[in-house]
Amino acid sequence: MTPAKGRVFLIHWNPSEAEEHAQRLCEAGWQVEIEAEDGARAGNAIKADPPQVVVIYLSRLPSHGRETAHYLRSTIATRSIPIVFVDGKGEALEKTRAKVPDAIYTTSEKLNSVLQKFTRV
């Protein structure tokens, strides 16, 4: 078995969609941990065992994803972990860019190529 490219922590507020997205990332060679219900739980898990990158979907409950990312940026232990926001649109995307300007923003279609820069060597 090929070693994983690295660990991704995926946050999506719809459990079945989170599983689908995680499956695609696993097929691309990533080890994936999911949180689909509780941003605070996600933040604590990320702080306890930091991944290479955090992926947050904005397609559902973008304010929850934005607040989780803000927590990660305001906590010393998680401040430097890259955050990738996926599928944001309109006002939700604008608010997120304003609150977390150093994050990467992409679409589901381009996520695998964006994640390549975080591959474990």
Regions found by a protein language model. Name each.
Residues 1-17, 104-121:
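Non-catalytic signal-transmission and effector/linker regions of two-component phosphorelay proteins
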Residues 11-12, 35-36, 54:
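Conserved sequence signature across two-component system core domains
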Residues 37-53:
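Acidic, metal-coordinating helix/loop segments flanking the phosphotransfer/catalytic sites
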Residues 55-74:
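Conserved phosphotransfer microenvironments
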Residues 63-67, 85-113:
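Alpha4 helix (beta4-alpha4-beta5 surface) of REC/receiver domains from two-component response regulators
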